[in-house]
């Protein structure tokens, strides 16, 4: 992404809004299981940022959130903040937010570029970002930090699976609605693109003078 385009007012505003959304997701008190890993809405917000904004802006929103939280703002899980959050066993999930947002956004943008963007595809991208990328990084660090065995970590992680799946579907569906309302959010496409699988899809056609929406 060209630096001038990346630093445009629109992109900065979008990154700020979604960073704020991730921070706001921690206002829900959530719940904490015996493992000490909290159940929060952060993952949902991170996936939505990546799926809606694309890889770079989505990852930037997650990074801004982490920077502000590390600086001391009480916007991490449990309304905590500061560098101490990076010393615990759940630090891998914090770092994984940036990677998960990037991968989710990259998958969505790739489908968009090919003109194959559907609700199912966006949900699938969110599933990869959450169930594969974020879980591997987060639970992998958890295992190393506490020196637990992989089977033991799997047993601890299993109660979170149902909630993760629900958040994947919500984030994917919400992102599809965003792209249906703002079909140019991820830029131009090579051919006809659909933001949902509805009978009346949004069509974005490239013209010699720019992009037109019909």
Q: Where do the PLM segments sit?
A:
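Hydrophobic alpha-helical transmembrane segments
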Residues: 12-17, 40, 44-48, 59-64, ...
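Short helix-perturbing small/polar motifs within transmembrane alpha-helices
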Residues: 24, 83-134
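Helix-loop junctions at the membrane-solvent interface of multi-pass transporters
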Residues: 28, 52, 78-79, 107, ...
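Alpha-helical transmembrane segments and their lipid-water interface positions
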Residues: 61-65, 73-76, 104, 137-138, ...
């Amino acid at each position: 992404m060209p630096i001038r385009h990346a630093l445009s007012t629109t992109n900065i505003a979008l990154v700020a809004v979604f960073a704020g959304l991730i921070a706001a997701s921690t206002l829900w008190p959530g719940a904490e299981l015996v493992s000490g890993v909290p159940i929060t809405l952060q993952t949902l917000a991170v996936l939505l940022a990546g799926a809606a904004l694309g890889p770079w802006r989505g990852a930037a929103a997650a990074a801004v959130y982490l920077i502000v939280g590390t600086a001391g703002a009480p916007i991490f899980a449990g309304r905590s903040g500061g560098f101490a959050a990076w010393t615990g066993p759940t630090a891998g999930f914090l770092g994984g937010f940036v990677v998960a947002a990037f991968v989710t956004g990259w998958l969505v943008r790739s489908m968009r570029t090919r003109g194959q963007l559907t609700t199912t595809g966006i949900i699938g991208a969110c599933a990869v970002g959450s169930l594969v990328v974020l879980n591997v990084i987060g639970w992998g660090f958890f295992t190393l930090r506490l020196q637990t065995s992989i089977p033991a970590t799997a047993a601890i992680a299993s109660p979170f699976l149902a909630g993760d799946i629900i958040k994947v579907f919500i984030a994917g569906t919400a992102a599809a609605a965003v792209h249906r309302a703002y079909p140019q959010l991820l830029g131009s496409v090579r051919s006809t693109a659909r933001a949902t699988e509805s009978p009346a899809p949004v069509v974005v056609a490239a013209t010699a003078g720019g992009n037109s929406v019909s």
